A protein has these predicted regions:
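N-terminal beta1-alpha1-beta2 submodule of the flavodoxin-like/Rossmannoid cofactor-binding fold
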Residues: 1-64
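FMN-binding flavodoxin-like domain, especially the glycine-rich phosphate-binding loop
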Residues: 50-127
Length: 127
């Protein structure tokens, strides 16, 4: 692998990407930066945040780069939901997938995502 590329919404995916970059000595780029700086076909580790099982930014990253592994950061416990995430994103069975638990900071969510979380929270606390 040549680089770590990430998409983050509330910062958890960016934090995991930075941690991985520190441990591997690989450069780290947001997906927007990577599109400008890395050549097509570069082998990358992709770190993206999860929304309803979809790894945000994965499709774009996979079209441009050679994704060697995926880290999906979401609300569930680390190591869970892997089959669901793999199926939802149509990840090949041979592609390593790691699910990681992130932080949910409602104040960092934008627009529709914040509204969806508010609705979910009301439903959960109602019971």
């Amino acid at each position: 692998m040549k680089a770590i590329v990430y998409t983050s919404n509330t910062g958890s995916a960016a934090q995991y990407a930075a941690l991985l970059a520190k441990e591997t000595a690989l450069p780290v780029y947001s997906l927007a930066e990577a599109v400008k700086k890395l050549p097509r076909g570069t082998e990358i580790l992709y770190v993206g945040w999860l929304m309803a099982g979809t790894v945000k930014g994965y499709k774009k990253a996979a079209k441009r780069f050679a994704v060697q592994a995926v880290c999906a950061v979401g609300m569930f416990e680390t190591g869970t939901q892997t089959e669901y995430v793999r199926k939802t994103n149509k990840l090949p069975p041979e592609l390593p997938l790691f699910t990681l638990q992130g932080n949910l900071d409602r104040n960092k969510l934008h627009g529709l995502y914040r509204l969806m979380i508010d609705i979910m929270r009301k439903g959960v606390t109602k019971g």
